[in-house]
């Protein structure tokens, strides 16, 4: 039996474990503070559900492990500075940017990037945390410790957000899912919609970009690339060197889920192109209690993470998939009264994708 240790024991590790069971792969999600002696890592392939981690007894051991897949890639992608430098090196389109070293640079920043600046911490920060949208009269809002530790990007006037989830094997082969349409609110992914056939031009551009990134890094496994949709084409926003929230729909909407695909890649199992036959919707459950009335609707698949419910915390998601978009739309309509009011706008956005 193959064994995989996942650095991190959140919902992504949980879903990797679930995906491993039918394949006969024992997946062990482990917390960062676990005692090395209690973790069967010596005979395992090592992967991670997070991009960066503090130094602990366990992470020191894993850092030396020869089967830690992508060990040298994580630091590059975890730092937005080196991530942006990678895009520039490969001549891939991304928002104009620079390192923000000192507050005296602001006049030149706005001269170069325009009236809206997006400031992001180089490391850490997710779901909208560690980011600021600033205009010239708002720069005092930025904490002093951010200078030298943040990049600043041009605010992009985009018409939509999409992500591409793909995987690369040890032999250099790559496979991709169709582009996923995403709705973010307050920096947090709320809803995703995927179709069997994405916009051909966007799909081709996205696959070319993500393939170039994975090949340059020698990356193995699933990677996600978030993009802005603009009249000039796709602009890369950020990368995630792991399974990704916007790929959760693949659990019920694809022949191979992103979690199984990642395990196949890192354990050197066959990596065929996943088949997607029907449209799918994913709704993130954020800071809301479980409601089993959702399951009265036959298209709804509930994925509950068994975490303590707290405001702003991802505690589960709902997947819906069907060949009949009218049935999907009707099911989404029936979900609205079963969800807290804050979900209505995301559900209506998903319905709008079906015309």
Outline where the language-model segments fall:
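ATP-binding N-terminal substructure of ATP-dependent carboxylate-amine bond-forming enzymes
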Residues: 1-85, 104
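Active-site nucleotide/adenylate-binding loops and adjacent lid/helix of ATP-dependent enzymes
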Residues: 78-163, 167-213
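A short linear hydrophobic-aromatic micro-motif
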Residues: 96, 116-119, 149-153, 223-224, ...
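Short, low-complexity Ser/Thr-rich regulatory SLiMs
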Residues: 166-170, 227-231, 306
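Active-site "cap" helix and flanking loop/linker of ATP-utilizing ligase/carboxylase catalytic domains
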Residues: 204-225, 230, 241-288
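Conserved protein kinase catalytic/activation segment
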Residues: 233-235
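Peripheral (often C-terminal) accessory segments that flank ATP-dependent C-N-forming ligase machineries
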Residues: 264-355
């Amino acid at each position: 039996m193959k064994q995989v240790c996942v650095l991190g024991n959140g919902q992504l590790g949980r879903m990797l474990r679930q995906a491993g069971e039918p394949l006969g792969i024992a997946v062990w999600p482990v917390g960062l503070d676990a005692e090395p002696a209690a973790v069967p890592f010596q005979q395992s392939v090592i992967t991670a559900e997070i991009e960066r981690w503090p130094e602990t007894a366990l992470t020191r051991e894993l850092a030396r492990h020869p089967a830690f897949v992508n060990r040298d890639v994580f630091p590059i992608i975890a730092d937005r500075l080196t991530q942006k430098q990678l895009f520039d090196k490969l001549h891939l389109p991304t928002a104009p940017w620079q390192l923000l070293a000192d507050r005296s640079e602001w006049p030149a920043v706005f001269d170069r990037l325009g009236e809206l600046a997006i400031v992001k911490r180089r490391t850490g920060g997710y779901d909208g945390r560690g980011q600021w949208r600033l205009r010239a009269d708002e720069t005092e809002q930025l904490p002093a410790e951010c200078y030298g530790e943040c990049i600043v990007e041009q605010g992009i006037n985009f018409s939509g957000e999409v992500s591409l989830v793909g995987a690369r094997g040890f032999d250099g082969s790559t496979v991709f899912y169709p582009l996923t349409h995403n709705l973010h609110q307050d920096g947090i992914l709320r809803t995703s919609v995927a179709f069997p056939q994405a916009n051909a031009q966007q799909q081709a551009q996205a696959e070319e970009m993500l393939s170039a990134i994975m090949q340059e890094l020698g990356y193995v496994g699933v990677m996600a690339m978030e993009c802005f949709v603009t009249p000039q084409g796709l602009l890369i926003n950020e990368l995630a060197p792991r399974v990704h929230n916007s790929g959760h729909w693949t659990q019920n909407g694809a022949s191979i889920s992103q979690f199984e695909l990642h395990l196949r890649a890192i354990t050197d199992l066959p990596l065929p192109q996943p088949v997607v036959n029907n449209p799918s919707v994913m709704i993130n459950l954020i800071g809301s209690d479980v409601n089993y009335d959702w399951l009265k609707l036959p298209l709804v698949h509930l994925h509950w993470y068994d975490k303590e419910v707290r405001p702003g915390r991802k505690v589960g998601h709902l997947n819906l998939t069907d060949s009949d978009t009218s049935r999907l739309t009707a099911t989404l309509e029936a979900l609205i009264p079963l969800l807290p009011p804050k979900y209505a706008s995301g559900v209506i956005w998903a319905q709008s994708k079906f015309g």
